[in-house]
Amino acid sequence: MMEYSYQFTHAIVRQPAKSIIKGLRAVDIGSPDYDQMISDHKDYVDALTSAGVAVINLTALDKFPDGQFVEDTALCLPKAVILMRPGAPSRLGEVNEIAPKLRELFEDVYEIENPGHIEGGDILVTGKEILVGRSARTDENGVRQLSGIVIPLGYVMREVFTPSEILHFKTDCSLLGPDEILSTKRLQASGCFDGYKVVNVADGEEAAANAIRVNDYVIMPGGFPQTKAILEEHGYKVKAINN
């Protein structure tokens, strides 16, 4: 079992830029409130810090409205980092912005190359394997390139298929334990988590699945009291924050 799949010493975040109001949206729910986003970002950093990690806070990138979503630009493993190649054209340049910091932190750096596309939001590292969800942002070529990198490093990788109504694989799931997944019912129904223990979010609280296990805590979006209670009933310590 790869226990380190939720054990972290460091986290990289990026301050939201004022241009975030021009960012990509799966569903148009109106323009974000910049001041609120800054406040929410601070709460996120505080939650990470209280979970026991050292936070590396990168400066905002005004030319990349989605630049704060650093997860999509790289897959960080204990001994190597793989630079992604985002599927959204407006986000391609984000990788070059974060790469220098990652090269400082990792000795072994790999890259997904043109014409492949893959985003970190479609990759879930469990205690058994690396699950990669094919999606509108992650294509067959990108998945194949990633497989060619991580399998020689000793990992097991499995491709799954994200339902078309879901933007990223991890929009609807997150890791709770080495063999336990928090998931929406619609994603679980695809069969991608066969062989795992699955905790379903409450009906109507699907957005709560986009959480993150960091050491002893599950950091999840606020406003989903039923799912928070479900996680606590399963023995997890939960930090709910605005996001």
Segments from the language model and where they lie:
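The feature marks the mature, well-folded catalytic cores of soluble enzymes
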Residues: 1-243
